Curated annotation (Swiss-Prot):
Any one of the GO BP annotations: 'de novo' UMP biosynthetic process
Entries under SUPFAM superfamilies matching the protein: PRTase-like (SSF53271)
Keyword Transport tagged: no
Gene Ontology molecular function terms on file: magnesium ion binding; orotate phosphoribosyltransferase activity
Secretion signal, residue range per the UniProt entry: none
Physiological role: Catalyzes the transfer of a ribosyl phosphate group from 5-phosphoribose 1-diphosphate to orotate, leading to the formation of orotidine monophosphate (OMP).
Obligatory cofactor(s): Mg(2+)
Protein name per Swiss-Prot or TrEMBL: Orotate phosphoribosyltransferase
Alphabetically ordered keywords of this record: Glycosyltransferase, Magnesium, Pyrimidine biosynthesis, Transferase
Length: 225
């Protein structure tokens, strides 16, 4: 049951951003940009994995993620909660516990043979699976996990993340074209607003990050090394 006292979507976004800032998960550096897995530079980087070491914040955000999924998708919409290797595993376990559902995880690469070679745990044909991850940038890695789940004969039409970059306009369309709805707690825009409110970084840095968020590809082209 969702208690009436649960915060609104907007309040969840603000509180999530505040908590991520509090634990030092948010990193801004416009002078020495971070290099993403794609090889492109970024003045912002977030480490949601740090959440597992902060039990009070971790518990609150998992409550938020669970209620967000239930509000958006329904109370009886799933039969199995799957985490993506490796960052999604602890969060999937915590959500599964709250929803009283079985938990599995999806490997990045197959182990063994057969259509369940990428699945650890018990996943059955026909089950409705929610994929849980820490974050998503362009949605690409989610589709790989979704495909692995569907190969078992289960269905997967929803993915839930703590953090969504929300700077690449094609992300939700890419997921939607594959029949996947995205649920999330907060975005870079929420973090930027909260960081400004807290004066967590100097205004030069915040303005530089804002320029990146408004046009990431142009910023990356100008700052490519």
């Amino acid at each position: 049951m969702i208690p009436a006292a649960y915060p609104t979507r907007e309040e969840i976004a603000r509180l999530t951003a505040r908590m991520l800032l509090e634990i030092g998960a948010v990193n801004f550096n416009t002078k020495e940009p971070y290099i993403l897995a794609s090889g492109l530079p970024s003045p912002s980087y977030i480490d949601c994995r740090k959440l597992i070491s902060f039990p009070r914040i971790r518990s609150t955000l998992m409550d938020f993620l669970t209620v967000t999924v239930m509000r958006n998708a329904g109370f009886e919409a799933f039969d199995n909660i799957a985490g993506g290797e490796t960052a999604g595993i602890p969060f999937a376990a915590l959500v599964a516990e709250r929803m009283a559902l079985p938990m599995t995880y999806v490997r990045k690469k197959p182990k063994g043979y057969g259509r369940n070679a990428r699945i650890e745990g018990a996943m059955s044909e026909g089950q409705r699976v929610l994929l849980v991850e820490d974050l998503t940038t362009d949605g690409g890695s989610k589709l790989s996990f979704v495909d692995a789940i569907r190969e078992t004969g289960a269905s997967c039409g929803h993915t839930a993340v703590i953090f969504y970059y929300d700077i690449f306009p094609e992300t939700e369309k890419t997921l939607g074209d594959h029949g996947v709805a995205l649920h999330y707690l907060c975005t870079w825009w929420d973090v930027l607003a909260e960081a400004r409110a807290q004066k967590a970084f100097d205004e030069v840095t915040l303005s530089g990050v804002e320029a990146f968020l408004k046009d990431p590809r142009a910023w990356q082209a100008a700052n490519k090394r």
